[in-house]
From Swiss-Prot:
This is Zinc finger and BTB domain-containing protein 18.2. Its main location: nucleus. Belongs to the krueppel C2H2-type zinc-finger protein family. ZBTB18 subfamily. Transcriptional repressor that plays a role in various developmental processes. Specifically binds the consensus DNA sequence 5'-[AC]ACATCTG[GT][AC]-3' which contains the E box core, and acts by recruiting chromatin remodeling multiprotein complexes. The gene is zbtb18.2. It is found in: Nucleus. Residues 279-288 have a biased composition (Polar residues). Gene3D superfamilies: Classic Zinc Finger (3.30.160.60), Potassium Channel Kv1.1, Chain A (3.30.710.10). Residues 127-149, 309-319 have a biased composition (Basic and acidic residues). It comes from Xenopus laevis (African clawed frog). InterPro entries: BTB/POZ_dom, SKP1/BTB/POZ_sf, Znf_C2H2_sf, Znf_C2H2_type. GO terms for cellular component: nucleus. A zinc finger (C2H2-type) spans 344-366, 384-406, 412-434, 440-463. Residues 24-91 form the BTB domain.
Amino acid sequence: MEFPDHSRQLLQCLSQQRHQGFLCDCTVLVGEAQFRAHRAVLASCSMYFHLFYRDQLDKRDIVHLNSDIVTAPAFSLLLQFMYEGKLEFSNLPVEDVLAAASYLHMYDIVKVCKGKLKDKELNSGEKIIDDGEKDDKPVDSEEHHEHSFDASQQKISTLDSVKPIWKEKVSGLSGLSSDLIGVNSVPAEAVMCKRAAGKTKANDSSPSSPLSQRSANHTHPPSDRDGALDLSFKPMPGRDSFHPSYVFGQLVSDSQQQGSLPLVKHEQDLLSEQEDSQAKSPKSQQVGNPAKSLVTGLGHMFTGNGNSHTREDDLYQDRDESEDEMDSSDLSTSGVLVSPGQICICPLCSKVFPSPHILQLHLSSHFKDKDNSRIKMSPDGSVPTCTICGKTFSCMYTLKRHERTHSGEKPFTCGQCGKSFQYSHNLSRHAVVHTREKPHACKWCERRFTQSGDLYRHIRKFHCGLVKSLVV
């Protein structure tokens, strides 16, 4: 059995209790105004109060609202709506109610206020149009007829004075018809327009000029100086020396393009960065890889003294020699005494090193292949390639990072909880959990979160309607 009037009676009882101050458990302060209310009603009607009371229910007896956004009359109106289900604007500005409803996340009220503002704009626009139509209506009076008659006589006299001038101008056009003048005699009309430019320019802009003169001026085609379109090629400023040095991965062998060498090297750097973020499949290499042909051409271009190794190979060779000279096993048995403040521990194998430089040299050994040899870019254009999926990378470091996705290796372990991660930046994000820091704050409800992803999920869940309303 249902009682349809139960909800209405419940609201009436709650409204009476609020006016009597009975069982009111919170006070809302808007500037100097105080409003006694029930937390359950506020949290049920406003998402702002719901989030406000959810964390610390016993310590939120007084709620301070921003008086710069929420005015006391607007909050009183919204409070009346919460307890009675009625919204009566009376003489209160709709903008104040909209601001207060947006601040309190009352989305139904926000939609109503926006609808009223749109209707107000439409009504004001229609009123302006109606007033303009009334002003444009002719006045049936004798004075108006006399004035229009005098104006027409003045226009006719002005037109008669202009006709002899036109006759002289047209007589010099070799008797061409009026239909062909606009096509074949543009230079002649251009000279005529230049001579009368000082007179017709003022007549076009002035509203009191005769209609016949204005129409005659607008019928003239534009002169060569004003209306001609310049289709000549003009190079862009600051890009005169820009010449593409390759097309689809093949180097241009033109001897005149001497300034294209730095551009090719710049394209190689961009290519390396693109390989890190988006790997290439073996199928695309079989069809024809433009990057491979470009690297092949560069291998022959930058050779010197008969050596075809790149600078990257030299760096790898220097690192290998340094690692051979200073092995970690020799460090542990050398008996060198180092102060505790200078000890550097490898985060991957927990070995101890006397300086950060030696630690960096040791870290590079973790990214070698199992046979203790580095995959280097050879002169024929081969690059480090994943043996499982066939993706290619610019260096060995990115290849090793990629191989963790197949092997599931997690070399970075948290020292407090023992949780492991594949990448170091994931371990850094996880460390915030143990420090109890909450650097990410919501600008609508002032809640704070440890991770940025938690903040984004919170906004999508609780403030999605408000964000859309603000964007609109």
